[in-house]
């Protein structure tokens, strides 16, 4: 029975990491080509955005520890799978923000650094809701003799997510090209980022609806 729960949460995290891992591909292109990185006369290299997530993690981990402890003491702490659904939803919000920021954006215009910063901040919030919880669930449900194998299954989801991330990043509308994904036409950056909005929200909603059932099986 434990395998079903592990496979279920592993399936949903694929969608999270596929959107999250755009930071190393399409989001870096966006930072380089369409983000105004000038700060008081200094142009920040696009690669520096990769340091935002680690910085946010260091700052936010204590906050999340306090938050979960507070909710636990008041009997309001969300179930583990619901935390993961919240993480997916937060990621979707981040992409929704940047999709709004680039809506009808002229290719020659660069947007404020705050749009991408906000996305990375929301990504980090989502990661802190999802990743530690997922590892904890796998570790808790796995029999001792299968713990390494099932942890490998969890890590395999990252491999699948990276493959999907690569496919999706190939849809980035560079040089005005129009692409499509499952019948959805991608003509500009807003269309592109909306892929991750729908993907994250859809996964979050389905996981939230299944949360009670999964928790009972755990």
Regions found by a protein language model. Name each.
Residues 1-2:
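Short, small-residue-biased leader/transition segments that mark boundaries at the very start
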């Amino acid at each position: 029975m434990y395998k079903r729960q592990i496979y279920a949460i592993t399936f949903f995290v694929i969608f999270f990491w596929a959107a999250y891992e755009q930071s190393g591909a399409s989001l870096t292109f966006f930072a380089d080509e369409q983000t105004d990185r000038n700060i008081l006369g200094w142009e920040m290299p696009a690669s520096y955005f990769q340091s935002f997530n680690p910085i946010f993690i260091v700052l936010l981990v204590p906050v999340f520890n306090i938050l979960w402890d507070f909710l636990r003491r008041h009997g309001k702490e969300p179930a583990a799978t619901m935390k993961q659904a919240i993480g997916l939803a937060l990621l979707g919000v981040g992409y929704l923000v940047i999709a709004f920021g680039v809506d009808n954006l002229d290719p020659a215009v660069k947007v404020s650094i705050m749009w991408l910063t906000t996305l990375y901040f929301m990504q980090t919030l989502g990661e802190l809701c999802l990743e530690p919880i997922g590892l904890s669930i796998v570790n808790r449900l796995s029999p001792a003799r299968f713990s390494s194998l099932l942890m490998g299954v969890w890590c395999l989801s990252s491999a699948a997510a990276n493959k999907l991330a690569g496919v999706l990043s190939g849809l980035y509308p560079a040089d005005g090209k129009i692409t499509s994904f499952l019948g959805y036409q991608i003509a500009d950056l807003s269309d592109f980022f909306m892929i991750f909005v729908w993907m994250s929200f859809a996964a979050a909603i389905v996981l939230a609806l299944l949360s009670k059932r999964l928790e009972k099986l755990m």
